[in-house]
């Protein structure tokens, strides 16, 4: 995935009110930008980190800049915009990088399903004519090379796992796909130290047949690229 226009580089001053970040672009004026990330962003939004923002030409937008990437003090790139995880998952599903997630007869994004009419990130029909429901999560919380999800207690993530288990009970395939959006992460686990219930649900889901995969991406100011699968330990 390439960025349509060159990103503006600056220095993060602070992130606040979940959706806002102040960034200094070296013009003696701090600019308020849109932060497209509702998570805690632990280790991703420290003052002084380098930040890259895209620029919108839409005159109706209150904030013309969107914070896309951060670079921490170790030089590691982090994809801040969580929407890119789903886009990269779409690219992944068109490749053979993860054989179990390839060779689709049909593939569609953001489909409604189930009794509650929830929206799954990706729905497909695999080469064996089985329906497959894929939930995508962006992983940026790092402790050295260990990645964790979620970075805060997430009732929404609990709901998604319960729905994936119901998909399996209905006779279909269900996949939890972690897109690793932090250069330093080499493996992924549920964040039991943050959300113990989520970790328990992951183990339960795996025991009934929900599939777990993680794929690492590599970001630069020009593009985000798929790199390779990394281990998931439950």
From Swiss-Prot:
Gene encoding this chain?
Answer: sfsA
Record the organism. Answer: Idiomarina loihiensis (strain ATCC BAA-735 / DSM 15497 / L2-TR)
The record's family statement is: Belongs to the SfsA family.
* Domain of life the protein comes from: Bacteria
Pfam families (alphabetical): SfsA, SfsA_N
List where this protein forms a coiled coil: none
Q: Which InterPro entries does the record associate with it?
A: SfsA (IPR005224), SfsA_C (IPR040452), SfsA_N (IPR041465)
Question: Which protein, by its recorded name, is this?
Answer: Sugar fermentation stimulation protein homolog
Q: Please list the GO terms describing molecular function.
A: DNA binding
């Amino acid at each position: 995935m390439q960025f349509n226009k060159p990103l503006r580089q600056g220095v993060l001053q602070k992130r606040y009110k979940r959706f806002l970040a102040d960034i200094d672009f070296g013009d003696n004026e701090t600019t308020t930008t849109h932060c497209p990330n509702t998570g805690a962003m632990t280790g991703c939004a420290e003052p002084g980190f380098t930040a890259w923002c895209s620029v919108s030409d839409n005159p109706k937008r209150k904030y013309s800049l969107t914070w896309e990437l951060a670079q921490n003090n170790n030089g590691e790139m982090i994809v801040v915009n969580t929407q890119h995880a789903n886009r990269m998952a779409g690219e992944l599903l068109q490749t053979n990088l993860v054989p179990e997630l390839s060779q689709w007869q049909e593939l569609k994004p953001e489909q409604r399903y189930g009794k509650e009419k929830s929206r799954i990130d990706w729905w497909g029909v695999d080469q064996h004519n089985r329906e497959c429901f894929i939930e995508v999560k962006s992983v940026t919380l790092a402790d050295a090379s260990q990645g964790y999800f979620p970075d805060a207690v997430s009732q929404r993530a609990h709901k998604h796992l319960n729905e994936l288990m119901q998909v399996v009970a209905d006779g279909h395939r269900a996949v939890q796909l972690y897109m690793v959006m932090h250069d330093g992460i080499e493996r992924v686990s549920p964040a039991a130290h943050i959300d113990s219930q989520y970790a328990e649900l992951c183990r339960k889901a795996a025991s009934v047949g929900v599939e777990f995969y993680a794929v690492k991406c590599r970001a630069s100011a020009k593009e985000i690229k798929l790199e390779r699968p990394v281990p998931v330990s439950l």
